[in-house]
Amino acid sequence: MGNSQTKEARPPFTPNRRSHGGGHGRSPYGDRHHSEGSRSTRGSRPDLSILGIGGSSERDVATLEHRRETKQEREARRLERERVARIKERERSMREEHVDGGYLVTQGVYTGTEDFNKAVVRQLMIERRLAPFWRGLNDFSDSWTEHQLMAAARGLPIPPPDEIPSELEYKNPPKITEGAKESTDTKGIQHLTVPITSRSQSYGSDASQSSTPAHSLPSPTSPLASGTSSSPLFRTRAKTLASLTTSKHGTQADPAPREIQLPRDPFVNGQPIEAYLYKDAAECPICFLYYPPYLNRTRCCDQPICSECFVQIKRPDPHPPEHGDSDPNAPAAAAEGDAADNQDSQLVSEPAACPFCVQPEFGVTYAPPPFRRGLTYASDPSARPNFTSPVSSTSSLSSGNVTAVTGRRRAASLSANDPTVITTDKVRPDWAQKLANARAHAARRSAAATALHTAAYLMNSNGNGGDSRTFNIGRRGVMRRAGGSDPHSSSSRTGSPALQALAFLTDRRSATNDMDSAEEGSGNIAPPRNTSRRNRIDDLEEMMMMEAIRLSLASEEERRKREEKEAKKEAKKREKEAKKAEKTARKTGLYSTNASGSALDVPTGLGRVASSSSSVIGEESTPAGKGKEVDRASPEAPIDATSTCSVTAPASMNAVYPPMNSADQHQSMQSSVPQTSPRELSKPSHLRHVSSASSSFSSLVESMSGDHTGTTEGNGSSTEPLFNFRSLAAVIGDEDKREESAEHVENTLSNPQAEGSASRSVLPVDHAHTDDSVFNADAATPAGSDFALQESQGYMIPKELETRSVEITDSTGNPQATS
């Protein structure tokens, strides 16, 4: 099936090896291949796993854990292997390879990541178009001798000038004889000979295979260095087949030039090569190390710079254009296909600038020394395709790619396209791919952000009601969703004037307002290609601005509501405190008034107050003031409840009138008490005192003349008011006429009651005039009200005062009435 291997793809001995897997060893392809094969086999043959042939679950778990551990450590092992390989390659290259006394690997000046293309740099150095990696000196002196220069160049301690260490001793090079010179020329000609097309295909294939290794460099002891071609005895069947297939039509595609090792010669003009190179050392202005004077020169300002500093200079990372300019050095395909997109928000990669004069398109030139040592190419790569030209085969070793070193400094700058100029882009040819990857990544992030913001806005719009099925992103869609909310949903944010203002803001750049509904529904989802990115960016910016303003308005509204709520709570608290203070002040003022006027002002002839007792008072609070309802219930004497201060009769009256139960007293009190409004109770005016005086003395008269009428037929439930006498003036007039034995009986029921009434209404004659004046003040005309008010001030008691039952004793020694 899909996971099982077909018959053609299986190894020839798979069934036999699988059947004898328990007795034989592991597969030669490794544990991973064996585990994958067994897993796929067990997955495709469940019957074997049921029978126990396919393997156990413990082995599967162990294999899975081992595979997971390998996956986690694979990258670390790979990095470690690469690091060890780089160290070995560096040591080998510094020991066996050099170019004119310099090296092809860095010398550790910079410890960062080497992200330049090492193959390109190696080729440029072997071609003498870029300076090799010279060994830098921390210190240099013009007075150093040859062996001191040699020690400094080799990294050894600098000896004294007059002392030559044994490892630095050298002998003068022997003179080259004619025979040796001819053999050397023959070897050089063999290395520079171009293969002839008339030779066999296998010979050309062997020569190309042996002399053009892809990544490994030849050593001096290799057959390539000795000049002998590989023997046909060492040819394998694979090489023969490859030569037949690749060289069938007589064309050879050799991508890499052929490297050769020049004869080893440690002397230049009779001097050691180190002494020759470092006798005129120059300082690099960037790393401040001393190098041989054969350094790179900037193309613009002709400043020296070493190769290690040069390979560290690169383009900045891709970034948005700072001044709205598109990348002038963008790839041609990108510039032609996405010209409209590049001008909007495409990332750009500006070329590196010169560290000295800040000229863009930084590049260097190199003038090699006048001698050749170490590695070189067999022929010029530009002349290799021309096989008919005999010049390349006869070119001498010393004359190839040698440029004359002029002592005069270059006066003019070179162009970045000059063939001798090496720019930073040539050292890092993958900058275009990195730029394309960065642009693709930025486009994906922008699309994801746009989708997220759009989805969030649509979700908010759907939750608020309205036309939730129009998934348009344009300004008109925003306007439509903002204005299309349900007017009945008061909690919706789209109905607020703030969001309407935002919707108007988003529509500020629209051209027309009448658009077809279908076109409006589609929005700006599929506009032309040249404006799609700009529209998406504008919509995203406006939606983000709308959301920010909406959040700001919402927070401001919430803050305002919170402040209003706190203000209301504070006002309510202050009002409550004011009411409480007013109530306390009123109560304190009333009690102080009561304290000053607590003694009942009665005529002096009536006697003194012997005792007082508090009565039950019903208190009722009203919004305008505080009124009190008098409920005076005495179990011994049935006294009228309408009076605030009553004068009790002698003790003989208690024997005449039996005590009344509390229900009869309460009913009698409710039927007899006049109803007063709260407004009247809360006004502390002189009219209130007048009414209090009237009520006091009317109750006094009632207690003297008509208390016995309150109980009819023994039940005491009379619905008729007790104030049914003619008038206070008439009653007082009748009392004056009868003098001391006067009687005023209404609704007389029996003789004992009449006698009791007569006994209760007996007052001293000398006080009748005073009481008469008070009672006449209550019934006087309005013209004489002021005089009556002044005269009766001594007998007024405020209505809110607690009613008290007092005993009045006669000066003549009448028996006291107990309350």
From Swiss-Prot:
Region (Disordered): 1-78, 157-265, 317-345, 478-497, 513-534, 556-779, 792-819
Compositionally skewed regions (Low complexity) per UniProt: 198-211, 327-344, 691-720
Principal subcellular localization: cytoplasm
GO cellular component: cytoplasm
Compositionally biased spans, kind Basic and acidic residues: 29-39, 57-78, 168-185, 317-326, 556-585, 734-746
This protein's record includes keyword Iron: no
UniProt keyword list: Cytoplasm
Function: May negatively regulate the snf1 kinase.
Protein name, as recorded: Protein sip5
